[in-house]
Amino acid sequence: MVNADRGPIVVLRSSAGDHLVRYTRALQQLSEISIGRHAVIGGFAVMVRLATAHRVTEDLDAVTWTEDGTPEAPIALLLEHGATRSRNGVDLGGVHIDLIAVSDYVPTQLPDDVDDAMFVITHSYSLASATWLTIEARATSDNLASRATARVATPAALVAMKLRAMQQRRANALNKRASDAYDVYRLLAAHDRDGSIARELATAPDGVGAWCVTRARDVFDTNAGQTRRWLATGSPDMAAVSVDDLRTVGTIFADALEDLLRD
C-alpha cells in the first residue's frame, strides 16, 4: 500500500504489552510540532523497516538538523508543546524521545578518531537519505489504533549507524550490543538479499562504505563467535542466530560492498 502524500504504508501488529501503539502516537505528535528537519532512527526505525516488532525497544530515537549541532532549540520547542525534559531529550505522550542533533560539517574538521567521526557522518547521512513512510500500529483486534507519517532512516543508514554504535557500547551495556548486532543481522537478511544495502552504502559520503566493510567483517566474520555470545544473552530469537548465520549475511554484504567500491 502507498500513501500518495507520505510514501508507502507500513503496518505494525501491536500485541498485548508492547509499546507500538504508544510509540506511533508519540511519533505523530512529534511530526506535528515544527522542530525542523528530522528522521526516525534507532530500534523503532528498524522495526518499521522490517515491518515487525522483532525485539523490545525502550524509547524513540530521532536525528534532527540544527544550526549549532545541539538539540537545545528543538527540545525547547517541544517543551512549549507539553513535553517534559528527560535524559538526552524529552518525554512526549508518555514516551521518551532521544534527540540527536547534527549540523553541516566540513570533512577536514571531523574528529581525528575514526569512530567519533563516523558518529557525525552516519547520523548526518541517515537524515539526508531518510524517506517518508506512513506507519500504522494495529492492536490485537486488528483495528487501526494509531498512525504516524514520518521520515525514517533507510535500512542502509541504519546498518551503518548500528555498526558504529556496537563499537562504542560500554562493557556494562551488553544488552545494547546484542540489540545492535541483531538489528544489523535482521536488516541485512531482509533487505540485502539483492545487494540493495551494499549498493546504497557504496555511494554514501566520506568513507562510510569502506568503514562498513571493515566493521562488518569484524563483527560478522572475524569475531562472529563473540557476536554470537552477545546474542545468546538476548531473547530466544536472538539466541537462535548461529555463527554460520552471522557469517553468511555478513560476508555476502561485505564482499558485495567491497566489490562495488572497487568499481
Over which residues does each language-model region extend?
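Compositionally biased terminal segments of proteins
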Residues: 1-263
